[in-house]
């Protein structure tokens, strides 16, 4: 006796198989590029101070230069737009961090400092240009899946409209994180980083759902440090040599080591992360700039 195909005896098996195939196909077809929100423009400036030349100045001239620099930096500091840090180690002596609404305003901040006499004693060592960025992996996967299930083609008019609606809702909800003031914490740790794009390990070729899963795991580590450290992530693809910049603000520095060490063990950091130089500094309030310069 010839046995009937399982799909005829159990038609639900055929349905389940086709459903699984559809789910797999849907996953493969999800748009690969996650949505991001951008906020303030950010510039880090690292300088070496020319102490031998500075010491050759008279005390009155030093005081004059210190007062001029403080006058230029005090207003943006009070607004949470600029901050000065005394760097540890040989990578530099001072680091200035600027948060502004645009690159034009960042350039104006640079030029304003360049026009002061203090600039004659600041030797540029490094800089980093970026914008505050919030990655929307969770929202992206949810939205892209819904659109794919409805058969909405990526980049179509309907697709773009729904994406923009989602972006606008998130933009309003995330506004405080997109447009923050520079935290007044005593310590700052800054470093740039990439996601690997090598032949063996390439972050950008992973399915978006897998990237979303790994980033969620990564974020859970950071959330355990809430209240101990404040993190601001900036995007720099197309702006600087690395893909992201990371600023960590805290009242004591050991938390930087503990947080970054723990993150080394999550999958996305262990397999796909590459890091640049680390800069650690102590907040130098503008009213104490003269003290830092040794001006009595």
Predicted ranges, named:
Residues 59-78, 114, 206-228, 264-266:
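Short amphipathic alpha-helical segments
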Residues 8-86:
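An N-terminus-focused feature that recognizes amino-terminal "leader" regions
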Residues 54-57, 103-108, 200-202, 253-258:
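Short, conserved charged micro-motifs
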Residues 247-296:
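C-terminal structured interaction module
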Residues 45, 88-102, 189-193, 239-263:
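Short, well-ordered beta-strand segments in beta-rich or mixed alpha/beta enzyme
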Residues 50, 76, 84-183, 251, ...:
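Hydrophobic, ordered structural segments
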Residues 153-232:
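Surface-exposed interaction/gating patches
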Residues 73-92, 119-134, 218-243, 259, ...:
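Short, glycine- and small/hydrophobic-rich beta-strand elements in well-ordered beta-sheets
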């Amino acid at each position: 006796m010839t046995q009937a195909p399982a799909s005829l005896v159990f038609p639900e098996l055929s349905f389940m198989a086709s459903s699984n195939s559809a789910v797999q196909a849907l996953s493969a077809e999800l748009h690969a590029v996650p949505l991001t929100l951008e906020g303030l423009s950010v510039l880090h400036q690292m300088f070496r101070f020319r102490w031998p030349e500075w010491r050759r100045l008279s005390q009155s001239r030093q005081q004059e230069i210190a007062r001029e620099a403080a006058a230029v930096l005090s207003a943006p500091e009070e607004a949470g737009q600029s901050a000065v840090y005394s760097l540890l180690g040989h990578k530099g002596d001072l680091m200035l961090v600027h948060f502004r609404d645009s690159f034009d305003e960042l350039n104006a901040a640079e030029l304003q400092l360049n026009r002061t006499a203090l600039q004659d004693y600041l030797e540029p060592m490094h800089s980093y240009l970026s914008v505050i960025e919030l990655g929307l992996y969770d929202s992206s996967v949810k939205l892209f899946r819904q659109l794919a299930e409805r058969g909405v083609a990526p980049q179509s008019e309907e697709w773009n409209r729904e994406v923009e609606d989602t972006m606008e809702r998130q933009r309003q909800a995330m506004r405080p994180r997109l447009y923050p003031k520079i935290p007044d914490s005593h310590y700052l740790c800054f470093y740039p980083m990439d996601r690997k794009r090598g032949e063996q390990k390439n972050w950008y070729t992973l399915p978006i759902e897998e990237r979303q899963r790994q980033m969620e795991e990564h974020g859970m580590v950071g959330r355990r440090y809430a209240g101990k450290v404040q993190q601001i992530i900036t995007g720099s693809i197309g702006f600087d040599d690395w893909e992201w910049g990371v600023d960590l603000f805290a009242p004591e520095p050991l938390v930087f080591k503990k947080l970054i060490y723990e993150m080394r063990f999550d999958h996305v950091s262990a397999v796909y992360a590459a890091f640049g130089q680390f800069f650690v500094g102590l907040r130098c309030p503008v009213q104490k700039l003269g003290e830092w310069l040794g001006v009595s």
